[in-house]
Design a protein with these regions (language model features):
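Hydrophobic N-terminal alpha-helices or hydrophobic patches in metabolic proteins across all domains
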Residues: 1-153
Length: 153
């Protein structure tokens, strides 16, 4: 479903990024699956391609979680919470990555800023976000359910 709605997810990501940039004082707009902003007197943009979207990774974990929940006794609630948290961390990391690319382009110029931030900083942010999301996901999905005793706070 996420992969089929990939275009809508990428449009949402671009709109969210435009909102984030505007909140920190950078004039920006979403245009389809891209966020655009003025740079050196002209409008430029960063596109959310399929590889730059949270949809494929989230879909992969959703499918894996469904298979795992079917094969072993996992709480569906824990799986849903885990996938939701995973998607949220992926989204935050991706928004931070794109904001970093925009900031570096504004600081270093279009070509050099994109090159440095997309390859080096963007990859580092994505890797840290991925690891954090997976660790959180595993902890949430595999945690022992809490049992409440009557009258306990």
């Amino acid at each position: 479903m996420l992969l089929l709605a990939g275009q809508a997810v990428r449009s949402f990501e671009a709109s969210a990024q435009a909102l984030v940039l505007n909140l920190v004082g950078v004039r920006a707009d979403a245009l389809g699956q891209a966020v655009i902003f003025p740079l050196q007197g002209r409008w430029v943009g960063v596109a959310f391609s399929l590889g730059c979207s949270v949809a494929p990774l989230t879909a992969l974990f959703l499918a894996g979680s469904a298979a795992a929940a079917w094969m072993r006794p996992l709480s569906y609630r824990s799986v849903l919470i885990g996938v939701g948290a995973l998607a949220l961390v992926f989204m935050v990391a991706n928004q931070l990555r794109i904001a970093t690319i925009v900031a570096m382009m504004r600081t270093m110029g279009f070509e050099r800023g994109y090159e440095v931030s997309h390859i080096f900083l963007g990859s580092a942010i994505s890797t840290i976000g991925f690891v954090a999301a997976v660790v959180l996901f595993v902890r949430l999905v595999l945690r022992e359910p809490t049992v409440r005793t009557p009258g306990a706070l």
